């Protein structure tokens, strides 16, 4: 009998040894895949042309075979294949890795193993097996038809609700003639809004209605504009003009308001709404606070041209004001405002989204989302609270919606760069600033502090002592016992340099070799030996105290404000007579039931270890930066509203007016707000409407 011997090559022998090592790790299951299944049919989709594919596991469509698994060569260590294969199968609840259901397999004639993902190959094999039993058996779901999803409950109601609840459409009389609202199709060169944006209402804002509101007071006033709908506002960045009306839906969620009625009025373009019952002379409808379903009004587009530009505000207005308050006790409800485009709404004149047009944008990014990024515009520490005041004021680093400021600093904290001149025989402790390298206003350094000293003092060597009754071991700061000669000044770290002449007869080099030292800076009137308070800044009123030179030289200094010399228990910037300004001091007062606020942060004080005092800021620094550099559109009688929420779900609205000051609808704020806070832009509302809030009852009056 003849015996046939098969000679194995070195690669074949090495491959067999490699498979034996895998068998030790996986068990006897590891081996060659002997199922007679065409890999084309197993993995390649039917819609792909596979007639010319001779290597499906090195396919031109790598995304098709990504689900098969990782390909390993037999030269890869078996331990590596096993470890990485286990890593793709997840873990048990106790953290142990799951053993793969299907071990690596090789296709006959190749020297590669395929470590499959869980279930991929098994699923394909079972699908083919099922098809051999019943050719009509489908292994995939047919999702070509639309599905209708329905939420079921035990409560009564119809099971056939498949669309959003729309509300009650209010018939407005007299209705404008349809021909007056028609848009010429030839005037639109852009594509109309897709149907999906036309079918549902999107949240716009919410307003409060209290039964103590006077009859005729304006609760809501909105001019027709794409910005009142979030989707229209987004799409508007692609177009230059628009036309058409907008539907507005109101939902009243009451808290015991019975018998009250609201009036919805349509005010034509060119007419400014006033707070009076005479507004009912305009076309209007009334709706009751007891209305359980939403009510829908349409703001028609009444225009004398074919289209509106994006910055046009002289359009039809929808105004809501109280017509009747039916109860004597004070009670409040919330009115949710939602919008959607009307059927005739369209955009026109396509433009690139990055191109700028002259009108401003929506003020939706003035306050950072997280309070960890809130820094004051008077001092550079993080905001830690709020102070509600009947009057708020600040000039330096305060900007309005016209991108203007009455101050002298940019909305960034940069080192203060100044020049000081020393002379023989003069006071070598107190100096005037003679020049500056960086200035928004000529002669006044960028970043120079904006408060002055509280009282007249002597220009002495700077006694930094406290009264004799001060006890060094005491843990209580007694600022009234501060007897230093330079209280109210700002403590700065300094880098100083001097120019050394070739013929150094006055030994200026000795002065240059002195170490940089602390400087105390302030705005004051310094003459002879007297330093007086000065609330109007000028290049001649910039005073510096430090152990200065006794030579005739000019010194350049770069200062960084680090702290403050304590004056009394009042926060820095809380007394208007001590706040420095160039000419006028911008101010904000209570209006429409809303109160102006300061943003409060901490500033370190000298002498006391780790001690701080409060500092008042008129704006968050990011707000100052946005207003200085951006172009925002906000009417003078409106507020850009942000909802501030703490970690305990308390919230209140902050409104920023056209002058850049911030308001809240409360006369005081709780002292237990849980930081960090979050900010959400809520839209634009009238400044005369009280801002909403939901905070705990136990509050303290801010000081």
UniProtKB/Swiss-Prot annotation:
SUPFAM superfamilies: Positive stranded ssRNA viruses (SSF88633). Gene3D superfamilies: 2.60.120.20. Keywords: Capsid protein, Host cytoplasm, T=3 icosahedral capsid protein, Virion. The record marks 152-153 as: Cleavage. GO terms for cellular component: host cell cytoplasm; T=3 icosahedral viral capsid. InterPro entries: Calicivirus_coat, Rhv-like, Viral_coat. Belongs to the caliciviridae capsid protein family. Capsid protein self assembles to form an icosahedral capsid with a T=3 symmetry, about 38 nm in diameter, and consisting of 180 capsid proteins. A smaller form of capsid with a diameter of 23 nm might be capsid proteins assembled as icosahedron with T=1 symmetry. The capsid encapsulates the genomic RNA and is decorated with VP2 proteins. Homodimer. Homomultimer. Interacts with the minor capsid protein VP2. May bind to VP3 and Vpg proteins. This is Capsid protein VP1. It comes from San Miguel sea lion virus serotype 4.
